[in-house]
């Protein structure tokens, strides 16, 4: 969190207006106790179907949010914070039925199971916590035409949920 104060003074030096702004970086990490983070690869173990690029997209996005929004140093193993888990579900199913009796919408859903270790505060540890996101698309579209965009949106949402649950504490 950064604080910035701006004040306007009149000719006599009297403050006539003042504003204070705060910039939040999204995390509430005590950097005197927590300096490093380690990630295990989150494999795609979906019982539904598997889309090849998803595993790499997810792992990259997860690491990126911590590297961009914290001052933690990434280490290969045994970080002060440790994240591991797996993509447990990726599926599509019919959502709505149109007047013609056919499905008008398809829902795409992704679920990730996360284990989190905070070595400086074990009360914040999580074991098997699930995070999910879903998106809908018109059944007139082929999944291959919308999959990249929708999976990116779901990954972004899930990664933000994980970040908030592990280091944002709000």
PLM regions with names:
Residues 1-8:
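Short, small-residue-biased leader/transition segments that mark boundaries at the very start
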Residues 9-16:
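Bacterial N-terminal signal peptides
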Residues 17-64, 71, 120, 164-170:
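A structural "domain/chain start" motif
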Residues 25, 68-73, 77-126, 130-145:
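Surface-exposed short loop/turn segments
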Residues 46, 50-58, 104-108, 143-155:
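Extracytoplasmic/periplasmic, Sec-exported soluble proteins
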Residues 147-170:
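Compositionally biased, intrinsically disordered linkers/stalks adjacent to structured regions
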């Amino acid at each position: 969190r950064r604080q910035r104060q701006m004040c306007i003074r009149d000719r006599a030096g009297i403050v006539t207006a003042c504003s204070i702004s705060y910039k939040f970086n999204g995390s509430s990490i005590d950097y005197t106790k927590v300096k490093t983070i380690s990630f295990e690869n989150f494999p795609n173990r979906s019982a539904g179907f598997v889309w090849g690029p998803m595993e790499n997209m997810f792992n990259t996005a997860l690491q990126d949010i911590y590297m961009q929004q914290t001052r933690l140093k990434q280490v290969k193993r045994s970080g002060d914070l440790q994240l591991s888990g797996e993509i447990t579900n990726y599926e599509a199913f019919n959502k709505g039925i149109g007047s013609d009796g056919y499905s008008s919408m398809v829902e795409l859903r992704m679920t990730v199971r996360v284990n989190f270790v905070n070595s400086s505060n074990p009360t914040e540890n999580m074991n098997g916590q699930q995070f999910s996101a879903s998106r809908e698309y018109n059944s007139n579209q082929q999944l291959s035409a919308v999959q990249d965009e929708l999976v990116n949106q779901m990954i972004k949402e899930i990664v933000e949920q994980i970040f908030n649950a592990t280091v944002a504490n709000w």
